[in-house]
């Protein structure tokens, strides 16, 4: 009796093992490669860019609301440290949110590194694209001198008062200036928006590229047109 019970248990266990093995090989069962990845495990550049960047910077790195990632001058003047800081921490007061997990975003440090490397590999331009360009960042600038820089280099498209001209829109619109940082303005002045017909720092007036001081001054002039933040109500 005891031996018969042992044989029965062994047979049941064997059958169970066969059934389990059979379930693993059922037609249509997803393979490991078919299983969805956790968001933090995604390492494909195209996927990361498409899900996190394309909405503002364009599906192909251009023609979005924000600066084009395929702009060779932009990629030449911004270093990896600065790009990582912008992606990780965002730009307070603008539409650029933080993407790093410690800052409230969803991306790991590794994923941010993949984005930086992928942007450079996918859209790298000529090595000398930014040769002679003013530095990516700078403080200061004189808005009074910037008035003259604007008149000589910008008003032909944006109008004498910056409110728009025959070929381009306003650069002093309160809503626009409230949504962009001084660094963004500086980047546009230096790198341009070629997909929109906006020249870079050396292409507006032939043979007369803007100096670093002139870039800082015209940015200061633009920033002076930004409305002051509204005061909070006391009651």
Regions found by a protein language model. Give the residues of each.
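C-terminal motif of bacterial Sec signal peptides marking the signal peptidase cleavage site
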Residues: 19-22
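The canonical Cys-X-X-Cys-His
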Residues: 45, 49-59, 115, 146-160, ...
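Electrostatic cytochrome c docking/interface patches
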Residues: 24-47, 121-149, 232-235
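Gly/Gly-Pro-rich "capping" loops immediately C-terminal to redox-active cysteine motifs
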Residues: 35, 39-42, 46, 58-88, ...
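Bacterial N-terminal signal peptides that target proteins for export
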Residues: 2-13
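Axial heme c-ligation environment in periplasmic c-type cytochrome domains
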Residues: 64-72, 89-122, 129-140, 165-170, ...
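Short, solvent-exposed loop/helix junctions and linker helices
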Residues: 39-43, 47-50, 77, 105-109, ...
